[in-house]
Amino acid sequence: MALKNFKPTSDGKRHQVAINYSELSNEGPERSLLAPLKRTGGRNNNGRMTVRHQGGGHKRRYRIIDFKRNKFDVPAKVARIEYDPNRTAFIALLHYADGEKSYILAPQRLQVGDTVVSAKTLDNVDVKPGNCMPLRVMPIGTIIHNVELKPGKGGQVARSAGNYIQLMGKEGKYAQLKMPSGEMRLVLLECMATVGMVSNPDNSNTKIGKAGRTRWMGKRPSVRGVVMNPVDHPHGGGEGRTSGGRHPVTPWGVPTKGKKTRSKTKASDRLIMRRRK
């Protein structure tokens, strides 16, 4: 999908680069697959802020996405490709042969009218974008997305716009996957994955253009610690402009900006063949 540039009719339009959504459906979403999305503003059940920089934004309804793809051997036709305000990727509405409807993440090159299917063997499914199958039946080198880490749990990785994972090899009961970060990881061969790359790869080339558009997305400003007072942040205070005077920390004094946060005893360490670069 192409990018769209704007004439500089205002400072907010001057540098804006947006996605051209002309190829997407302009019908409303499928009502049976919608759920309410309550806004929290970053507050918990006590009303206290637990996540900063959240609040405001346009009201949304959640689209129920089928990440498990466990309706096997029933072909489904792509009725339309839609915009989803809750994620960077586009979504595809499927009409199954038995009358059921569901949303899936739309892979690149999936078109309206295409047929997709989910299966356990290659007898009933081809290796083409949108089809879902276990890693054990996929050819080595296949580009995939929406990959499970535990069989039956549903896809957890490679779900955002333009992302993909490559199947590099198989050994024993594990598949060797090259993750979007460059990490090489072992995943059980029984885990399901969908063929293809996630749609909307140009999302990373967009420019928001103005602060107000970020507010429409529900994001509030992020204030630097060095411009706060000492009571508010460890970097605060000082006479005139200062650099903070110490290595970067969070408002609670925890090292940040490059400090490794992964647990040294994480069980999944044995499944990581090579760390990300």
UniProtKB/Swiss-Prot annotation:
Residue spans of biased composition, Basic and acidic residues class: 266-277
Region listing for Disordered, in residue ranges: 227-277
UniProt keywords, alphabetically: Ribonucleoprotein, Ribosomal protein, RNA-binding, rRNA-binding
The keyword Iron appears for this protein: no
Gene3D superfamilies assigned: 2.30.30.30, Nucleic acid-binding proteins (2.40.50.140), Ribosomal protein L2, domain 3 (4.10.950.10)
Alphabetical list of InterPro entries matching this protein: NA-bd_OB-fold, Rib_uL2_dom2, Ribosomal_uL2, Ribosomal_uL2_bac/org-type, Ribosomal_uL2_C, Ribosomal_uL2_CS, Ribosomal_uL2_dom3, Ribosomal_uL2_RNA-bd_dom
One term of GO molecular function: structural constituent of ribosome
Matches recorded under Pfam families: Ribosomal_L2, Ribosomal_L2_C
GO cellular component: large ribosomal subunit
Gene Ontology process terms (BP): cytoplasmic translation
Keyword Ribonucleoprotein: yes
UniProt record similarity statement: Belongs to the universal ribosomal protein uL2 family.
Function statement: One of the primary rRNA binding proteins. Required for association of the 30S and 50S subunits to form the 70S ribosome, for tRNA binding and peptide bond formation. It has been suggested to have peptidyltransferase activity; this is somewhat controversial. Makes several contacts with the 16S rRNA in the 70S ribosome.
Summary of subunit composition and partner proteins: Part of the 50S ribosomal subunit. Forms a bridge to the 30S subunit in the 70S ribosome.
Protein's name according to its UniProt entry: Large ribosomal subunit protein uL2
Organism: Magnetococcus marinus (strain ATCC BAA-1437 / JCM 17883 / MC-1)
